Regions:
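Amphipathic, hydrophobic secondary-structure cores in small proteins
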Residues: 2-59
Length: 67
């Protein structure tokens, strides 16, 4: 992820679960994680942010792409 890049975090409560979505402000790429509603928002946001970083890396690195 580029330094100073903007990441938006969205939380959607769905019953006993929360969906946290991290969105890259520059590219619009999204990554989501789901966890229990009792989980701290900071933990879900961190997991979504890490997943977004992985997805962005996967898009640019041929070694991480599947067959």
């Amino acid at each position: 992820m580029p330094a100073g890049g903007e990441i938006f975090i969205e939380f959607v409560i769905q019953g006993n679960f929360v969906k946290a979505t991290a969105i890259d402000g520059a590219s619009g790429v999204e990554a989501s994680v789901v966890g229990p509603a009792s989980a701290p928002q900071a933990a879900l946001a961190d997991a979504a942010r890490r997943k977004l970083e992985y997805v962005l890396k996967k898009k640019t690195s041929p070694s991480l792409k599947g067959p």
